[in-house]
């Protein structure tokens, strides 16, 4: 108490001096230690989930329990995936349609098609880093389609070169950087063909029981990578698409092209799936996969024997492993792969730790714990005890022969009795202590579990012995490592009063924790504000405030110093050793077992961790690839072309009630249809083909108009020639028999002064008229007779049978067959 009084008096005096001479805006350097450095503790998105294992069974140790010494090796199930390289081969065809106009080329449809590379072409890739520039595709109906790179109708070889973009897991090699394009003829459509070979060196992963494997490209193969066609491994892909070759030579790395180093593959598989060809090396599963993995080696162990089980206790791991008494024989090849490894570890541990004082007490034994761990136990015995046992056998033999050695016999009995008594006593003590220790640890773990609900970070930090950030997520703890900041950049503010935006300190609001500024390691020198927490933890932000309490004295620990704040202003810093410690630690007074603290913290099993994930990436990728394969040749396009004004009119008419709604629907449908028609016409006119067709139609219409106009002018200039073209034929006479009328027309002189025309007509009830008339004088009667003669002449030509009618009068084939043997009779003769 006297020290505390002196401390506070010193603080009061220093406070008085500093309030006068010290500027509160200055900083002080905050101290830290190696155990609790300045750090930021927060829960990241990807954290480790842990729980306290309270389901611990403490078997009662009887007085006859046997304890033995030794060391053991623990193997766990190997949950790592089997990783192996896979090559994929595909050929990508690009068809670019275009239309060439004057001075411009229009790109139209572009079709990209992927095809799996055939196996014989994959052999060319693996041997020469080349592929062919042609591709052939056979349709189900037997039709074969062929395509050539750059439309040259030649099957050449193309060299593979690495793609600029590559990742750690994938490397791609191609033959064409940019698709080929050719300018077609003017005003015509054309299509350019480009071919690109794509070879990908990917990494595949398979998980036990190896029923499928996934590539880093996201593709899935539903089959075991160890399937060789006859070993019975799971393989769900079509077997007719699988090709297996033996003693296959291939380029190991395509980066150097055909100059790359080659390797001999004992057995390789090629699988054609959708638009890709896969290839991978087929290995023996027992040689490539080991289901067990070394976890840890306990160099100092204790085995306690109960009625049915063994308890293997480790001081190093602070854990106990329970296993049945029946030992195992590892016969599975995927488990015997660890034999050479653990035998080597046994020899190394014995030679380094026990060779001088202990001897191996028999051979090793293999057990399977209740947690499905494989434990290899090597019992040991002290060499001094073994020497006594061997010496007792020699003394007894000599005792049977020589009697003078009886003293030694009595002495040995006493020694043996003492040894047996001490051994039983020690075994009983160790058994009882182990049981009590187990119960105590069980209670301690239960207490830690309950305390973790109050302060999880403190509990977990004490368990691990270093600063750990923990947060309770339901029934489990999410832990993460704290981020250390630049220790030399941490500065502690002297004032704890809140400063507003104008830089004025508040008289009523204060921070409940001191302000600090710091910077991160390997970052810009920009300082970051925060507040000092417990054990040098930095709390981000400065929102932790409270109402100022005057007077008040607060002491905050930082490193090896205690910082005193009086009325929220730093007044003094004193070493932490000056403050007395409340000693609540109860020390164990038993020297042999003073450090035998058993603490059991069990991690989640791999299955539990996998089930705790919200998104199962494997199932998502498998579903995606299944959907991709199912819809490989399907392409859907959806478009909505409803004009915006139609929706506006419909919304307006909906306010008119039911009638308006119905009328609006009708108008919307009608307007939409008209809009589609108009839009289609406009689109057709905008299309080069539609524009060209309309131009041709316009030219045809203009030509028709010109032809009609010229013909009309010709008719107006020469009506007789246009109306009666046969009048210009060199016909001298035309006879027409119509009743008793006969018309004869000799040469007729035209109105322009040609040959004279004499017309004679004999008609019933009319007199014969003959004579010549002049070019310029015609009587009305003569003109009327001329018109009648022209009319009669026209009718005679019209009544003359045409060639088509003459052909129609001929008998048909059926009539000729029907009336064969008969001869047709001329009508005039008849």
From Swiss-Prot:
Intravirion-side positions: 710-830
UniProt-annotated stretches for the region Involved in fusion and/or binding to host membrane: 98-104, 184-191
TM regions (residue ranges): 689-709
GO cellular component: host cell endosome membrane; host cell Golgi membrane; host cell plasma membrane; membrane; viral envelope; virion membrane
Statement: the UniProt record of this protein carries the keyword Membrane: yes
UniProt key word Cytoplasm: no
Family of this protein: Belongs to the herpesviridae glycoprotein B family.
Protein name: Envelope glycoprotein B
Species of provenance: Human herpesvirus 6A (strain GS)
Underlying gene: gB
């Amino acid at each position: 108490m006297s020290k505390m009084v002196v401390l506070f008096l010193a603080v009061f005096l220093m406070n008085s001096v500093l309030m006068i001479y010290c500027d509160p805006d200055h900083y002080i350097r905050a101290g830290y230690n190696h155990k609790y450095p300045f750090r930021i503790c927060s829960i990241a998105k990807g954290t480790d989930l842990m729980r306290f294992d309270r389901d611990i069974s403490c078997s009662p140790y009887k007085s006859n329990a046997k304890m033995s010494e030794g060391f053991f090796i623990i193997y766990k199930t190997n949950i790592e995936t089997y990783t192996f390289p896979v090559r994929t081969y595909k050929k990508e065809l690009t068809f670019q349609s275009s239309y060439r106009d004057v001075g411009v080329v229009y790109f139209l449809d572009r079709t990209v098609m992927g095809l799996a590379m055939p196996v014989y072409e994959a052999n060319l890739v693996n041997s020469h880093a080349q592929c062919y520039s042609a591709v052939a595709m056979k349709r189900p109906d037997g039709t074969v389609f062929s395509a050539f790179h750059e439309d040259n109708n030649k099957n050449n070889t193309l060299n593979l070169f690495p793609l600029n973009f590559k990742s750690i897991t994938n490397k791609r090699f191609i033959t064409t950087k940019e698709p080929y394009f050719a300018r077609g003829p003017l005003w015509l459509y054309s299509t350019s063909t480009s071919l690109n070979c794509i070879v990908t060196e990917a990494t595949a992963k398979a998980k036990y029981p190896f029923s499928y494997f996934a590539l880093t490209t996201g593709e899935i193969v539903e089959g075991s990578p160890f399937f060789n066609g006859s070993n019975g491994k799971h393989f769900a892909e079509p077997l007719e698409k699988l090709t297996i070759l033996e003693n296959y030579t291939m380029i190991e790395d395509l980066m150097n092209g055909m100059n790359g180093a080659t390797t001999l593959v004992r057995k390789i598989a090629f699988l054609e799936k959708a638009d890709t060809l896969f290839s991978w090396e087929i290995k023996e599963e027992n040689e490539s996969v080991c289901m067990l993995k070394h976890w840890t080696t306990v160099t100092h162990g204790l085995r306690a024997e109960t009625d049915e089980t063994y308890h293997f206790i480790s001081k190093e791991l602070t854990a106990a492993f329970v296993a049945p008494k029946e030992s195992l024989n590892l016969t599975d090849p995927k488990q015997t792969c660890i034999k050479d490894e653990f035998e080597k570890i046994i020899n190394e541990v014995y030679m380094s730790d026990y060779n001088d004082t202990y001897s191996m007490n028999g051979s090793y034994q293999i057990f399977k714990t209740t947690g499905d761990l494989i434990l290899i136990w090597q019992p040991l015995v002290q060499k001094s005890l073994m020497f006594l046992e061997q010496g007792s056998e020699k003394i007894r033999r000599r005792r049977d022969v020589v009697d003078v050695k009886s003293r030694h016999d009595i002495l040995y009995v006493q020694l043996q009795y003492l040894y047996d008594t001490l051994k039983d006593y020690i075994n009983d003590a160790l058994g009882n202590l182990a049981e009590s220790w187990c119960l105590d640890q069980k209670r301690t773990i239960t207490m830690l579990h309950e305390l973790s609900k109050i302060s999880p970070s403190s509990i977990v930090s004490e368990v691990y012995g270093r600063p750990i950030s923990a947060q309770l997520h339901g029934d489990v703890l999410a832990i993460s490592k704290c981020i250390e900041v630049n220790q030399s950049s941490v500065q502690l503010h002297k004032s704890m009063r809140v400063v507003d935006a104008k830089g004025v300190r508040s008289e009523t609001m204060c921070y409940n924790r001191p302000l600090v500024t710091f910077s991160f390691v390997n970052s810009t020198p920009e300082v970051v504000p925060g507040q000092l927490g417990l054990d040098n933890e930095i709390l981000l932000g400065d929102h932790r405030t409270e109402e100022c309490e005057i007077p008040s004295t607060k002491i905050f620990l930082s490193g090896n110093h205690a910082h005193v704040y009086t009325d929220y202003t730093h007044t003094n810093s004193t070493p932490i050793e000056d403050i007395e410690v409340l000693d609540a630690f109860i020390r164990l007074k038993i020297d042999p077992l003073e450090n035998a603290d058993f603490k059991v913290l069990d991690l989640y099993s791999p299955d539990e961790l996998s089930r705790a994930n919200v998104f199962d990436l494997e199932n998502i990728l498998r579903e995606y690839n299944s959907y991709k394969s199912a819809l490989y040749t399907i392409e859907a396009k959806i478009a909505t072309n409803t004009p915006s004004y139609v929706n506006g009119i419909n919304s307006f008419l909906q306010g008119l009630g039911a009638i308006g709604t119905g009328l609006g629907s009708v108008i919307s449908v009608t307007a939409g249809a008209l809009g589609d028609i108009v839009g289609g016409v406009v689109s057709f006119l905008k299309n080069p083909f539609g524009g060209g067709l309309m131009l041709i139609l316009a030219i045809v219409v203009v030509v028709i108009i010109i032809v009609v106009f010229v013909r009309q002018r010709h008719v107006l200039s020469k009506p007789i020639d246009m109306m009666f073209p046969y009048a210009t034929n060199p016909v001298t006479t035309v006879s027409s028999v119509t009743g008793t009328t006969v018309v004869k027309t000799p040469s007729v002189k035209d109105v322009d002064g040609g040959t004279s025309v004499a017309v004679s007509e004999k008609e019933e009830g009319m007199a014969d008229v003959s004579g010549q008339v002049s070019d310029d004088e015609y009587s009305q009667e003569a003109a009327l007779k001329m018109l009648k003669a022209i009319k009669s002449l026209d009718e005679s030509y019209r009544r003359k049978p045409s060639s088509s009618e003459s052909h129609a009068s001929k008998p048909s084939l059926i009539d000729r067959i029907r009336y064969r043997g008969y001869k047709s009779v001329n009508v005039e003769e008849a």
